[in-house]
Amino acid sequence: MKLFKLVNFTKSYDLIWLVITPFVPLLIFYRIIIGKEEILRIKERFGYPSTTRNKKDKLIWLHAASLGEVASATSLAIGFKKANYKGLILITSGTKTSSEFTKNYKDIIHQYHPLDKKKWVNRFISFWEPDILIVMESDIWPNLIFCSKNFGLPVVMASAQISNKSFTRMKNLGFSSTANLFNKVDLILATDKTQSEKFLQLGAKKVLTAKSLKISLPPQKTDQLYIENLRKGISNKIIILAASTREGEESILINSIQKLNKKNHNVFLIIAPRHIQRANKISKINNLNIKIKSKDGLPSSYDNFWISNTYGEMSNLYSLADIVFVGGSLYPFGGHNPSEPCHYKTKIIMGPHSEKCQDIVREMKNSNALIQLNSNSEDEIINSIEKIIINKDFSKSLSIAGSKLAKSWLKIKTNIAYKILKKFPLLVS
């Protein structure tokens, strides 16, 4: 019965791909137009390589969805190197921002992941000949898993987690269907005990509790000359960075900063939106005509707001900021990871929504390294910022607590790498 359901599912999935394949070029063309695909690398989406591979070396394949998951994958890649893995590391992902992120790490090969049609996935695996597939978090594509197993690859899920919404949806598929899928995974390293329990309820058997790899990524290098020039333009204002903001959040934050400045707090807001193509729309909020980096350059002392819309900027901005507001948290977007700014000894605030990073948020709050708001009200945002500005001892304690946590997190990636290498010794033979 289980085998029948699995065969039935794969046949249905293959049939879906048969129907939609003629429309894939239109989808790719549309994504090129809206700036979400690199035209010179389109062939990667169909499993063709855009670079070479030394077949003499072992190759670990880390698959991630977008920027957040690629940060986890990069963290694990560094962990493998620290654990004395000598082979190649390939990261696949689906977004331009994630591809750009990997350029900071010379030992990593990046390719856009093939779309999940069996023919294209098989073509990809046939060329790259990976020794293992490690899926980051929960970016599970059926043919990615099935084809990898057909090629005899071990499959691991690292930093594994499932949102409540996805968990409910998967439970509705039925236990036997999800069990058949997850039992093709040789090892699941969940981010916490709650996540481990979710995978067990879906029929997975080989589950261990580890931690999130996102929090173990070391800070990237900063451009001190650029930071100094940016600071000179802003002058002596208190700098707040709104990091990875989502639609609707910028208006609330801009209103809050305007009210703070009416109270003579002399605050400057840098907005770094999660999706940089929204920069023009953000610049028009409250008819402010906010300067955008890509068009207008750096801010001056006459500005109170500035939009950073270029890639590879966050480490510089975290280093510059006195206070960081973590976006995706004022409305139910799940919240973005608040751990990264801890490495830069800044003060961190986020909104009430943290469904996607509850464990990290809980740890940071328990260590007094994070202010989490109870609502998205402007008054609460203003009060939190004022507390940091006025209470110097409180402000200092926030920074110190975050910095201590960041140092402890750096060990996680190597510990997880050792677990995987111990489980699959062929990777080091």
How would you label these PLM feature ranges?
Residues 1-429:
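Nucleotide-activated sugar donor-binding and catalytic core shared by glycosyltransferases
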